Regions:
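Long, structured stretches of catalytic cores involved in phosphate-ester chemistry, encompassing
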Residues: 1-188
Length: 188
């Protein structure tokens, strides 16, 4: 991490800080951003193109990323993003694993021209894996950010991983459900 780099501007920090302090038991909060706050994809464009650290993500600069995540967590908000061409559900870590907010990066509506994959180099599950998918659990991304991968939709299905996300807020139970659907699936 380099000193002097910023991720969010001062107005954005101020807004998140003030918004986060407004607590109302009947309100659930979400922060929307163009892209995720970590390197949630390893392979870009093809299975032969492994990136160590994706500079197209908001995973850097780390100080800026961590400051933003702390504000999102203090607001008791979830993070919803796009732009990564790979649907993921990640529990962010700031100082330690899982001490940050939850994030859902929704899939791309079209994903067959520049796909991305979650594919750890060692092809092993991380610690605390839920065993639902082969490569979930605790990992460090290419920027050394702590992330816990809970779900991902690699482009190895008929839909190439393209689709859309639905986020359901249950105010009574104080629960958020992230759903990922193939592009042509009618979920009515």
């Amino acid at each position: 991490d380099l000193d002097g780099l910023t991720l969010l501007g001062e107005r954005q920090h101020k807004f998140l800080s003030e918004w986060g302090k407004k607590q109302n038991s009947s309100v659930m909060k979400a922060v929307l951003s163009q892209t995720g706050f970590c390197g949630g994809a390893h392979l870009h464009g093809s299975k032969e193109n492994r990136l160590h650290a994706d500079l197209d993500s908001n995973g850097w600069p780390q100080k800026g990323r961590n400051k933003a995540l702390k504000l999102i967590k203090e607001a008791n908000a979830v993070h919803i993003a796009g732009d990564q061409h790979l649907a993921t559900v990640i529990h962010h870590g700031i100082d330690k694993f899982e001490d940050g907010p939850w994030a859902f990066v929704v899939p791309a509506i079209v994903n067959n021209y520049y796909s991305r994959w979650w594919w750890p180099k060692n092809e092993k599950s991380g610690k605390k894996s839920n065993k639902v998918l082969p490569w979930n659990g605790r990992y460090l991304d290419g920027f050394n950010n702590k992330i816990t991968m809970h779900a991902y939709a690699n482009p190895d299905s008929d839909s190439s991983g393209s689709g859309y996300g639905i986020i359901k807020f249950n105010k009574k139970k104080k629960e958020v459900t992230f759903e990922c659907w193939p592009r042509y699936q009618d979920v009515r």
